[in-house]
């Protein structure tokens, strides 16, 4: 979608909101993230992260504040303890009760998976936790008769009666830091339990789950707010798909507007199907709203906002004949098309338009963005629940800020916008409701800065007078009447060149993330978060990186496709992002990823919900993940290491045999001594060439990417 192309389909200065110069020539998938050696990290026996128990633990009280047991499991462990202790007299109670309680309660330890050697679900689970040698020896001396009551493992039962050393050897862990009770005493392991893990540079370590793939530039993912917990994914070409709570996709699309949507396969084309929003009362009126590029009369390019309805005969299909055009705006250029639609808490529809394109907003004396009579470069607010008296298909809210200003368009809610790419409404803190209703936007910059804004009524966001915190047009910037709203955060193009706005996390599954505004950059592929200081109301940026060993849970991945197109929130409040490895509107390389905090989860059962049933007439397409999980990669690395060690042993043995035979013969020449051993049946490796999606070879680039920049040109002066 993106960049400056000298083609009949694009214009100079044409840049997609999510792409910057010098990237789209990378045809091969570019994945971020890496996997290191598996190291200890908090993990429970169900292979999930630990949590804070919602109720007090009466028995395993050492793990009352954080661990792997809720009250139900705590009571089950207590019942087993008393069942075992019923076999002992009073003296044995005093002697062994503490040991047995300690051992049973290790299921509640935040490091339970390591104590039971259960990090990998493919390996068998221990019957007893790993005990440190001194502790194990003391337990065996005092209470070896209890072992048969604690485990039915025949090897452990046979070993304890003969030799305590043998028994303790079987319970030994390779890393003594994780055996009990050392794991309790290790300050490094317990210092930051329950908070988001950070690497040495302070980067927040999160993980991902792949939930969808094979999409053509997925630009939007929204839910209907109707209790069904479906989500609707829009592709740039104009097709919208329905995904069900079980992860499957319906075979028939919800909406197909390919014949009407204006876009091309060219990387750099920003036009297309750009926005989708469901009416707050969708469950009753079946209405939703779409934002797309189209050709009007005399081939004038327009952006169109329309209302549509869901089919009466199929709740998973739009009625193609129901489209009612709400608003059309002429586009003077093919870029900076905006594209966001959302409903505020006030029930009004907010529309986010770009400044009309080209570079520097060159239209008129002040540009479109500063011209309140233009609908370009604006945040618009309209009432779609009825028509106006003058024949317009919407009403203007009476409290819009410029309703009474001569020359200003009454639909304008805020102005001075360059090209806001992805905005979101904050649900508010789930307990205090703090922040509820705030609207966050990422506004793509020109030459130097990308910014994140909080939208306020009547606000002027500075463009083209300012870019980020700095002046862009010095003459306009010196205007005392500018009175612009500064970004809550801006970053330079050394970090990234095309911001993708995100969401404030308000979900249930990852409570540590509550209140973090998570966003990214299309060009650099960076994931970032903003954290608010409630006292100063200032925001601090935190980098997000994907964990390596911290993501060693079933189903979690630590890599993603580089080009971050959009962010999303499901009906339960969990966060996702949409990305592609090849940003063309017709290339099926887009995926959707869900954020997961591996450091802490919600207590079991807290986040359960029961979706409202929805009838499906279309066949379901089962999701098949393409990304390798961290556990898969670790297993592969382990197998490679084992093969390498085996080959080294085999080669060493062969060399010894050859040496013994050669001692009776003439010494080999220096040339023959350089030959390497190749196993029977193996062939000499040939160079592998991976084709680009277009079937072309990847261009040779110097260390500074000059070849790439020359191919791409610059998307703005």
Swiss-Prot record:
Composition skew (Polar residues), residue ranges: 646-662
GO CC annotation terms, alphabetical: extracellular region
Pfam families linked: Folate_rec, GSDH
UniProt keyword list: Disulfide bond, Glycoprotein, Secreted, Signal
Annotated InterPro entries: 6-blade_b-propeller_TolB-like, Folate_rcpt-like, Glc/Sorbosone_DH, Quinoprot_gluc/sorb_DH_b-prop
Range of residues in the leader sequence: 1-40
Region (Disordered), start-end ranges: 642-717
Gene3D superfamilies xref list: TolB, C-terminal domain (2.120.10.30)
TM annotation in the entry: none
Key word Lipoprotein present: no
Keyword Secreted on entry: yes
Disulfide bonds: 203-545, 207-551, 423-441, 508-607
Main location: secreted
UniProt subcellular location: Secreted
Glycosylation sites: 647
Ranges annotated as biased composition (Basic residues): 672-687
SUPFAM superfamilies: Soluble quinoprotein glucose dehydrogenase
PANTHER family the UniProt entry points to: HEDGEHOG-INTERACTING PROTEIN, HHIP-LIKE PROTEIN 2
Family statement drawn from the similarity comment of this UniProt entry: Belongs to the HHIP family.
Name of the featured protein: HHIP-like protein 2
Gene transcribed to yield this protein: Hhipl2
């Amino acid at each position: 979608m993106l960049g400056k192309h000298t083609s009949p389909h694009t214009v100079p200065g044409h840049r997609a909101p999510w792409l910057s110069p010098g990237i789209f020539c990378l045809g091969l998938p570019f994945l971020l993230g890496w996997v290191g050696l598996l190291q200890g990290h908090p993990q429970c026996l169900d292979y999930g992260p630990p949590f804070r128990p919602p109720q007090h633990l009466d028995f395993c009280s050492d793990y009352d504040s954080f661990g792997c047991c809720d009250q139900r499991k705590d009571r089950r462990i207590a019942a087993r303890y008393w069942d075992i202790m019923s076999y002992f007299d009073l003296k044995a109670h005093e002697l062994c009760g503490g040991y047995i309680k300690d051992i049973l309660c290790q299921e509640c330890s935040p490091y339970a998976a390591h104590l039971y050697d259960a990090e990998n679900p493919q390996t068998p689970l221990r019957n007893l936790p790993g005990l440190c040698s001194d502790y194990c020896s003391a337990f065996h001396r005092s209470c070896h008769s209890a072992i048969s009551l604690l485990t039915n493992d025949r090897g452990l039962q046979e070993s304890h009666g003969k030799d305590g050393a043998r028994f303790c050897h079987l319970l030994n862990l390779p890393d003594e830091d994780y055996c009990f009770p050392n794991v309790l005493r290790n300050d490094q392991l317990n210092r930051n339990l329950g908070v988001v893990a950070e690497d040495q540079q302070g980067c927040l370590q999160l993980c991902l789950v792949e939930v969808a793939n094979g999409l053509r530039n997925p630009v939007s993912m929204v839910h209907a707010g109707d209790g069904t917990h479906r989500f609707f994914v829009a592709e740039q070409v104009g097709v919208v798909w329905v995904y069900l709570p079980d992860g499957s996709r319906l075979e028939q699309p919800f909406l197909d507007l390919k014949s009407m949507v204006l876009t091309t396969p060219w990387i750099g084309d920003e036009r297309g199907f750009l926005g989708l929003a469901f009416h707050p009362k969708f469950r009753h009126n079946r209405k939703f709203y779409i934002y797309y590029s189209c050709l009007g009369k005399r081939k004038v390019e327009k952006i169109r906002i329309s209302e549509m309805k869901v089919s009466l005969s199929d709740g998973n299909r739009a009625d193609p004949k129901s489209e009612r055009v709400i608003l059309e705006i002429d586009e003077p250029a093919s870029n900076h098309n905006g594209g966001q639609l959302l409903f505020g808490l006030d029930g009004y529809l907010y529309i986010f338009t770009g400044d009309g394109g080209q570079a520097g907003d060159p239209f008129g004396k002040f540009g479109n963005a500063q011209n309140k009579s233009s609908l370009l470069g604006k945040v618009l607010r309209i009432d779609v629940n009825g028509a106006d008296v003058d024949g317009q298909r919407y009403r203007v809210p009476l409290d819009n800020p410029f309703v009474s200003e001569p020359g200003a368009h009454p639909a304008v809610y805020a102005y001075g916008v360059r090209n806001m790419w992805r905005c979101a409404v904050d649900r508010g803190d789930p307990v205090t409701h703090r922040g509820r209703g705030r609207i966050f936007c990422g506004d793509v910059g020109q030459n130097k800065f990308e910014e994140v804004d909080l939208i306020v009524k009547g606000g002027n966001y500075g463009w083209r007078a300012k870019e980020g915190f700095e002046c862009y047009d010095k003459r306009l910037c010196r205007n005392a009447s500018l009175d612009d709203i500064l970004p809550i955060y801006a970053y330079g193009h050394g970090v990234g060149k095309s911001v993708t706005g995100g969401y404030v996390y308000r979900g249930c599954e990852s409570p540590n993330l509550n209140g973090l505004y998570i966003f990214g950059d299309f060009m650099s592929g960076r994931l970032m978060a903003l954290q608010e200081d409630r006292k100063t109301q200032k925001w601090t940026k935190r980098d997000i990186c994907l964990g390596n060993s911290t993501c060693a849970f079933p189903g979690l991945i630590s890599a993603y496709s580089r080009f971050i197109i959009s962010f999303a929130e499901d009906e339960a409040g969990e966060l996702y992002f949409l990305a592609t490895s090849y940003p063309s509107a017709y290339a099926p390389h887009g995926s959707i990823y869900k954020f997961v905090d591996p450091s802490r989860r919600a207590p079991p059962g807290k986040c359960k919900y029961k979706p409202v049933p929805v009838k499906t007439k279309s066949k379901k397409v089962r999701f098949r993940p393409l990304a390798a999980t961290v556990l898969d990669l670790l297993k592969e690395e382990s197998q490679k290491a084992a093969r390498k060690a085996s080959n080294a042993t085999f080669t060493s043995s062969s060399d010894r045999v050859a040496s013994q035979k050669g001692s009776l013969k003439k010494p080999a020449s220096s040339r023959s001594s350089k030959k390497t051993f190749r196993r029977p049946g193996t062939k000499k490796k040939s160079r592998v060439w991976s084709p680009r999606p277009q079937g072309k070879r990847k261009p040779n680039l110097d260390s500074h990417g000059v070849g790439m920049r020359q191919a791409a040109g610059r998307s703005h002066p």
